[in-house]
Amino acid sequence: KERLLETHLFLKKKRCGKIKGRTVAGGNKQRGYIDKHDASSPTVSTQALLLTCIVEAHEGRDVMTVDIPNAFIQTRVEDPQHRVLVKIKGYLAELLLEIAPEVYGDYVYVDKKGIPVIIAECWNAIYGTMIAGLLYYVKFCGTLDRLGFVANPYEACVHNRIAAEKQQTVCFHVDDLKSSGEEVANDQLVKEL
């Protein structure tokens, strides 16, 4: 019961008028049994980021930034020890039941206050859990590896490859990426990701 994480749904109206929803798990409960040093994802250092900016300006590189959409939820949690149980309740539970009654119907119960509740084991990384960032980091580094990038030996979140006969550099912080090189190489990277 102590490892059961509450979920929270946050809605935000974007400038374009669309409503963006984000469901997160309350990973703060995990602090009692997961050490943050065992679960933290590396991030690009300020010095490395600034150094790449200097190189980009000096070489006249094309620079782009990309946000990888839905990064965590696309990351499979292979180790059962890292999977979490989440409690989905209220409107979100009702919505899931309405969308897919054949999937969730057997797993919904009503609590003492009359609120529908679903307990689910997550086989994919969930935003808000302590281990999600690290699992995504490992997956993303594997993707960069397959695309021919080589990790910088001094900076875990800076990777390089030769593309369009010139060096291409990526720096990243979890699911936010900065790439520099030839424009054609940056365009190709977007397609590859």
Describe these PLM feature segments:
Residues K1-L193:
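Long, low-complexity, charge-biased intrinsically disordered regions
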